[in-house]
Structures are given as C-alpha cells and as structure tokens.
Swiss-Prot record:
Source organism per UniProt: Carcharhinus obscurus
Keyword Heme in annotation: no
Domain of life: Eukaryota
Name recorded for this polypeptide: Myelin basic protein
Family: Belongs to the myelin basic protein family.
Role played: This protein may function to maintain proper structure of myelin.
Chain intervals with Basic and acidic residues compositional bias: 11-23, 96-107
GO annotation, cellular component aspect: myelin sheath; plasma membrane
C-alpha cells in the first residue's frame, strides 16, 4: 500500500469525470473517496480523507519504502503544499474549480512527469 502508484492511476483514470462536481473532489484523492461520497456524502468523505492522510503520514511511511529517493519527500510536499491541506473542506468551494482544470492538465501530463522527476529528486521544478 504505497502512495506513488495510486497517484498515477487516479491522476489519469479519473480525468474523464472532471466535469462532475462530486468526482472532482475525488480526483486528487483515492478511489476510496469515490465510493465514500456515493455512500454517505461528506461524512464518510471526511473520514476517508483522514484515513488517507493517516496512511500517508504514518510512522511506517509506506511511501518512503516504495520510492525512497526524493519522491517521498516530494510527494509529501506536493500533497500538503498544493491541494492536500484542504481537500475535504475546500472542495465544496474554491478548490472545486481549480481541481477541475488541474485534473485535466496535470492529470496525465504534469502529475506523471512530476513523479518521474520526484524519484530522481528534482521535486521543485516539477511542482512549478
């Protein structure tokens, strides 16, 4: 259970759903959120986000084991620095629209290249 691989998949596979607002919220999250907001809306959505971050930032740090060069650090910086710090309460408002276009552009292109670069340890140029 790592972080890097599902970033790639949800980045590119969830792009077609960018038009729907509930789907937009799950674009930068995991498929778990997709099921969550269907089942119980905001409530489960929130806990799924929390679970996602607990899993991501746990002391075991599955991400670091998977990509132990610069990627884990870059991933963390990317998540918390960009949209990760306000996915569950920002998605309803401002972050919704920008996630829509982020999903379209960054989904396949920048996001994947970001991880290729991040593994080499060049996280910052990819973030811009």
């Amino acid at each position: 259970a790592g972080g890097a691989h599902f970033f790639g998949q949800e980045g590119s596979r969830k792009v077609p759903e960018k038009g729907k607002e509930p789907a937009t919220r799950s674009v930068l999250m995991a498929p778990t959120l997709h099921k969550a907001h269907q089942a119980a809306g905001r409530q489960t959505d929130d806990s799924a986000v929390v679970h996602f971050f607990k899993n991501m930032m746990s002391p075991k740090a599955p991400v670091q084991q998977k990509a132990r060069s610069g990627a884990s650090r870059a991933i963390t910086k990317f998540i918390w620095g960009t949209d990760g710090q306000r996915p569950h309460y920002g998605a309803s408002g401002s972050s919704k629209s920008r996630e829509a276009y982020r999903g379209r552009k960054d989904g396949s292109g920048t996001l994947s290249s970001f991880f290729k670069m991040g593994k080499k340890g060049e996280g910052s140029p990819a973030r811009r």
